[in-house]
Amino acid sequence: MINFDFINDCLASLNTMRNDVGSMKNINILSDMIKEAILDNQTIYITGIGKPGYIAQKNAATLKSIMVDGQFIDACLAGHGDLGPISVDKPSLLIAMSKSGCSNELYVLFKYMKQLRPKCKVVMICMSNEMQLNKVRSCKDIDFICHIKTDPGELDGFGIVPATSNIIFEAVMSTAIYGAFKSEELGIVNMCERLQKSHPSGTLQSKVTNLLNTLRN
């Protein structure tokens, strides 16, 4: 008999987030920042330490699939030449994910980004407790703290083995990106048009084409 405690924990954590006014407000602000970056053709950098790093890679790929310049940054390698071309005058957005919000590698990255790209806005998505949140708030390089109020039990049930928190990170990012394209300035048709251009072959191309024909009629 399969034990569904993990699924129940995920649902409970998502519901806690959904029912928290502050968390929902923060996700809305993040969505608006993503929307403005897309409208301004900015590069959106996404990073995370450990397992959230894989969530960051996935969401950078999601942005690319809808013709947005989404780039994953390995925070550990950023200070060793991996930041790529430097455009001091071009605004950009850096979104970092850390459950505690206290990953030192991220703070080093924030410092580099602000030095090399002064117009880059830095966002920290975290599930910090109050003590951890004090450290996040003390960082002057962070422009916006997307604090999510939830207490995931993780795979082990004691908050140790990352699993539930990664689902929360994915939910936050997907909601924010989807919300950006639900806005009047962009719209779902715009997202589908971008998806159509980035998928010139395969079954998805025909599905998107049919959907666009339906939406336009």
Annotated model-derived regions:
Residues M1-V21, V189-G202:
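Cofactor-/ligand-binding subdomain signature composed of acidic, glycine-rich
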Residues N3, E36-I49, H199-N217:
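Glycine-rich phosphate/diphosphate-binding loops and the adjacent beta-loop-alpha structural elements
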Residues F4, N8-L11, M24-S31, G53, ...:
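Electropositive phosphate-/nucleotide-binding environments in soluble metabolic enzymes
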Residues C10-S13, M17, L30-M33, N59, ...:
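A ubiquitous structural signal for well-ordered alpha-helices
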Residues N15-K25, L94-S103:
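Short, glycine-rich nucleotide/cofactor-binding loops
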Residues N19-D40:
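A short, well-structured juxtamembrane/interface segment
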Residues T43-E184:
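Glycine-rich phosphate-binding loops that contact phosphosugars or nucleotide phosphates
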Residues D151-G157, G179-R216:
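Internal, active-site/partner-interface "lid" segment
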